[in-house]
């Protein structure tokens, strides 16, 4: 299985002669979702002349990051909030919440039916990616459960979503997006409630404002940490990185991103009715997008904001940390053991990072060969100065520049 087969692509064809065009079925209702997403992109560009904001909103609403500046995309990834652009449960929850605000239907069945129809159309419109298919199916289960007088079960709906996806395309199991989406959701289902209860239990006072703040922080932190439980090994394997700032980033950025998503959706829909009104709403979206990018950039300037598995000792630390917390989970109920485990994991992490920095510098000048898949890449470094000689091949599936940058970051 490859990345192509996971997306249902089993053959690559190359044109050798001149291209010819023929009349097709562009006007067919079959292509309505594609025409809708095209119209959405055109309207976004008309509402926000600022290219950076338009690209951010397009990525947020449709998952298409092709227009984003490389710097903005890299900042969001390093801050641990790139999942905002992977259309998933977060977007579906925002969309259902927005529908509840815009369409205050008294009848629960009618409201649930409208929400399901919109979710299915949105799912097809953004391209039937595994993450959005999983999210929409789980959201439909959640909406349908009260109507059928049943309780919604997270593991059941998650399993049903996986079954539907694999029945349609068994090769999708090799897709990175499917693995990350289901791993994050499994962590949320298994651990989010427990972690939230633990954090809320740290404050035993009765002051409502303080309790509201504690509940808000607990909900965000528990969701971030729970989603990371099973995704950290995958991000280490596929992206060679581990964002230490992800919980803090989600706490500071996610609320603003949620409001920007809903306001951008309303502004874009308003743009089809009256463009000046949409541009007025667009100023609010612009401010929220500026805040998100500024905050993400500020967090990535903090020392140690991310760790790179170019540090060969970091993978051993990761195994140690998982073994440590697994041992805590299968032993007694005392909470103090988790504090001890966190302290031990933090101390050994500092030792791991420091050891790699120390051992990567043997003298006044050093040379290192970096594995970039195909071709060669050599680092020459002395003190705080470094030079990259060659940087692999453009035919490699590895992002050569990112791999070299990760190696330099891991050496301090």
What is the role of each PLM region?
Residues 60, 88, 127, 177, ...:
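Divalent metal-coordination and catalytic microenvironments
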């Amino acid at each position: 299985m490859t990345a192509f087969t996971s997306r249902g692509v089993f053959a690559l064809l190359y044109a050798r002669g001149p291209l010819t065009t023929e009349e097709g079925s562009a006007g067919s209702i079959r292509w309505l979702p594609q025409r809708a997403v095209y119209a959405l992109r055109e309207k976004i560009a008309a509402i926000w002349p600022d290219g950076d904001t338009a690209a951010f909103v397009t990525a947020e609403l449709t998952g298409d990051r092709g227009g984003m500046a490389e710097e903005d995309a890299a900042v969001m990834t390093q801050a641990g909030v790139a999942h905002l652009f992977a259309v998933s449960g977060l977007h579906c929850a925002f969309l259902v919440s927005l529908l509840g605000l815009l369409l205050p239907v008294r009848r629960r069945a009618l409201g649930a039916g409208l929400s399901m129809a919109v979710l299915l159309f949105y799912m097809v419109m953004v391209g039937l990616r595994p993450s959005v298919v999983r999210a929409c199916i789980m959201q439909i289960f959640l909406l349908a459960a009260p109507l059928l007088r049943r309780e919604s079960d997270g593991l059941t709906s998650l399993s049903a979503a996986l079954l539907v996806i694999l029945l349609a395309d068994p090769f999708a199991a090799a897709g990175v997006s499917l693995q990350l989406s289901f791993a994050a959701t499994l962590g949320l289902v298994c651990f989010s409630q427990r972690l939230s209860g633990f954090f809320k239990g740290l404050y035993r006072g009765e002051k409502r404002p303080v309790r509201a703040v504690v509940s808000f922080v607990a909900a965000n932190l528990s969701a971030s940490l729970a989603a990371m439980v099973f995704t950290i090994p995958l991000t280490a394997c596929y992206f060679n990185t581990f964002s230490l700032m992800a919980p803090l980033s989600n706490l500071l950025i996610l609320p603003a991103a949620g409001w920007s998503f809903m306001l951008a959706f309303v502004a874009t829909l308003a743009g089809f009715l009256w463009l000046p009104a949409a541009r007025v709403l667009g100023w609010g979206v612009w401010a929220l997008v500026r805040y998100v990018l500024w905050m993400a950039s500020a967090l990535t300037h903090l020392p140690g904001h991310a760790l790179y598995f170019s540090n060969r000792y970091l993978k051993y630390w990761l195994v140690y940390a998982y073994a440590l917390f697994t041992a805590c989970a299968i032993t007694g109920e005392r909470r103090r053991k988790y504090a001890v485990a966190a302290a031990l994991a933090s101390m050994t992490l500092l030792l791991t990072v420091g050891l790699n920095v120390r051992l990567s510098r043997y003298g006044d000048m050093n040379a290192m060969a970096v594995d970039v898949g195909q071709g060669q890449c050599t680092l020459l470094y002395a003190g705080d100065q470094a030079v990259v000689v060659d940087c692999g091949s453009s035919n490699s599936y590895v992002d050569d520049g990112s791999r070299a940058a990760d190696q330099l970051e891991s050496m301090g």
